[in-house]
Amino acid sequence: MPNSPVTVLSENPISVAPEFFGMHANRRAFDRLPGIMLKTVRGHDLQNGKGRWRFIETSDNTWTFTDLDAWVNTHYDAGRDLLFTLYGTPTWASARPTEIGAYGPGNPGTQAEPADMTKWDRFCAKIASRYRGKIKYYEVWNEPNMYNDGTAPIPGTTFFFSGTFAKLAEIVRRANIAIKAVDPTAKIVSPAVTNWAAKAGQSAENYFTGMMAAPTGDGSTTMKDWVDIVGVHLYLSSGNSTADLAGMIDRVNAAKAAAGVSSMETWDTESAPIAPNASALSDDQLDRYLTRFMVTAAAKGIARTMYYQWDNDVMGFRERINIGGRWNALRELLLSGSILSASKLFDGRLIYRTSTGTTIV
């Protein structure tokens, strides 16, 4: 009903798989994330960024795997699904080796595509060969639309990708070919577009459809032909407005339909409160954020969501025992399928019904 104070999120029971709950670790590649239950981990920014290509292949065909080995083995041994982000061009391989982006002057050229794309092929194949059977999922690049409209980045900004739609599409195609030649069961997650909004025609939606339709350089395919899963980042607007989340997911689904990839799962590979961040929230406030976010995401069909980050000083909650306990309780609630329906009020509060009554958060 127009102007209704209540928006139905789901009229059916809400249930998720164990893989729905995911996490990042920032500082310790060997951190098993004790105290919280989860099934999916993402490797972006592991050990303060040591999972980026530039720190793994430090010069042409010279490799350092210490931190990545620790991360992979720790979480594989814990029985978790691993999502590894292929990203971060070394200066020596960069198409624009003096370019400065999100990681500052100490990491020149990182945001550019490789000058010689066969170096990218070799990197992807090397990772897939070393971790075959352990890493199942590969995400290609990180937030390519940050200060980039698909033609070029805005100079002087903290962009993560400085290439074009076509270059990004080629990167995805070549990663798919290199990885699946080694491990045909591996899955490719699309570059995760960020800055979604709950309105039509916004920049994230336009970027997503543009990149999915971009030619890959082989004369016949576009990016959508080379991805298996859609990745997005569902950071909320100022005030961590969970009231906007359902509308954001609706726009993701509209963009997927326009791109011809509606049948693919959607993974929120990175999200957290940022305006303000977790360190500025009380336990009660962070608890409300997590409950509203997770239940809404589950109700709207997000297959996995990965909190950023467990042990970050401003975004994490490693030392907050109450939040860890609430995370685990929320996980059990969603795994049980006991939420029979869910709605949201205009002010962002969540209402969900179980067999024992109604809860407002």
Model-predicted segments: where are they?
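N-terminal substrate-binding region of glycoside hydrolase catalytic domains
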Residues: P2-R132, Y137-V140, P144-F161
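Aromatic- and carboxylate-lined catalytic core of secreted/periplasmic carbohydrate-active enzymes
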Residues: S4-L9, T291-V361
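Structural recognition of the beta-strand scaffold that forms the well-ordered cores
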Residues: E19-A25, L38-N48, D81-L86, K136-V140, ...
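Short, solvent-exposed loop/turn segments at secondary-structure junctions
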Residues: R28, N48, T89-T91, N145, ...
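Mature extracellular/periplasmic domains of secretome proteins
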Residues: A29-G35, T216-D218, T296-A297
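Anion (oxyanion) recognition and catalysis
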Residues: Y76, K180, A298
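A structural signal for short coil/turn segments at secondary-structure junctions
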Residues: G79, Y131, I135, D183, ...
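Active-site cleft segment of glycoside hydrolase catalytic domains centered on the general acid/base Glu
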Residues: T98-V227, H233-A254, P276-F293, G316-R318
